[in-house]
Curated annotation (Swiss-Prot):
Residues binding 1D-myo-inositol 2-(L-cysteinylamino)-2-deoxy-alpha-D-glucopyranoside, per UniProt: 36, 214, 253, 272, 310
Amino acids binding acetyl-CoA 2: 276-278, 283-289, 315-320
Enzyme class: transferase
Protein name: Mycothiol acetyltransferase
Phylogenetic classification of the source organism: Bacteria, Bacillati, Actinomycetota, Actinomycetes, Frankiales
Protein family: Belongs to the acetyltransferase family. MshD subfamily.
Coiled coil: none
Organism field: Frankia casuarinae (strain DSM 45818 / CECT 9043 / HFP020203 / CcI3)
């Protein structure tokens, strides 16, 4: 049997189990199963806003029942089988994170590869929808990698595909040509100074991503959590100024290991165009492209052989700019939307 448990915070053992679960899913699927926001929430005792964790826990170490497919409306029956001997009793075999605000919740769901097809995913999604308090609640669940199994489950549970996030990549090895960045007249670029630039950067970030459901909502705490990460390096965080005011930025990131390298490639470090933003109506034409190139040149000088970035598929202007700089689509993440049926 499998039991579901809601947690406001996680124990150290919970975190270890979830991290192992994520690693197993990543090996099986070839893509990371959760976002950076969720990974940053996986800290013992940490509570972030209204975020909550839903754990699917194996209640028996060894069962002999047949595989049962995910079947809506029969969650208890669907959870009666686990892989014999694979996961001890009390270990986490499925995980969901619920965030966002009351009437517009966002979630991510992952099931251990050895326990798929047994109703765990259906049970987790059912637990998420049941937890929504408001009568008009809406829920968006991210499925990383656009996997067929996730699409099939979403269809069965009446979720609608609404948003696609592209991961783009391009080579960056020494000698790979990059155009010269051309800054608009009067614009200068320097690197980020922690504490000094935090609030100014947050203001420009919020304005640049006013219509973005995640990036535009960043707070000082969100920035502080990332500054505390081992990958944070202000030398790769570029700020554009005009007349002393911040008008744009390019924050780069270096991953120690590419968790989803191309097939038959040895995993190594990879750079990331973490976030590029320009203050609306400021800075002049071409500032976003120039900032992108400045960051790419920095990553190339750091010895990175390739670079990735994430962009919404419907952000046609940004996609056009990135493809014009040699980026191609590597993987897709999909958001599925659900609304509580009207009772009227």
């Amino acid at each position: 049997m499998t039991s579901l448990s809601w947690q406001q915070t996680l124990s150290a053992m919970d975190v270890d189990d979830i991290v192992s679960l994520l690693a197993a899913a990543e090996r099986a699927d070839g893509t990371g199963p959760v976002s950076e926001d969720v990974r940053l929430a996986l800290r013992p005792g940490l509570r972030i806003g209204a975020g909550r964790h839903l754990l699917a826990v194996s209640a028996a170490a060894d069962t002999s029942g047949p595989n049962v497919p995910d079947t809506p409306g029969d969650q208890n029956a669907a959870d009666t089988s686990t892989m014999p001997g694979r996961v001890p009793a009390g270990r986490i075999i499925g995980y969901a994170h619920l965030g966002g605000v009351d009437q517009a919740r966002q979630a991510e769901v992952v099931v251990h590869p050895d326990h798929r097809g047994r109703g765990v995913g259906t049970a987790l999604v059912g637990g998420l929808t049941e937890a929504l308090a408001a009568p008009s609640s809406r829920l968006d669940i991210w499925a990383h990698g656009d996997l067929p199994a996730a699409a099939a489950l979403a269809t069965r549970l009446t979720f609608t595909r609404t948003r696609v996030l592209l991961q783009l990549r391009r080579p960056l090895a020494a000698g790979t040509p990059l155009p010269d960045p051309r800054l608009p007249a009067g614009v200068t670029v320097r690197t980020f100074v922690p504490d000094q630039d935090d609030r100014a950067w947050l203001a420009v970030n919020a304005a640049a991503f006013a219509d973005h459901p995640e990036q535009g909502r960043w707070t000082l705490d969100d920035l502080a959590r990332r500054r505390a990460e081992p990958w944070f390096d202000p030398r790769g965080f570029f700020l554009a100024e005009h007349d002393g005011a911040l008008v744009g930025f390019h924050w780069t990131k270096v991953h120690e290991t590419d968790q989803t390298p191309p097939r038959n490639a040895q995993p190594g470090p990879i750079g990331e165009v973490y976030v590029v933003g320009v203050l609306p109506g400021a800075g002049g034409a071409g500032l976003g492209r120039a900032l992108t190139l400045i960051g790419l040149r920095h990553l190339q000088a750091e010895g990175l052989d390739s670079v990735l970035l994430y962009v919404d598929e419907d952000n046609v202007r940004a996609v056009r700019m990135y493809t014009g700089l040699g980026f191609i689509t590597y993987v897709r993440d999909v958001s599925y939307h659900w609304e509580r049926p009207s009772t009227g």
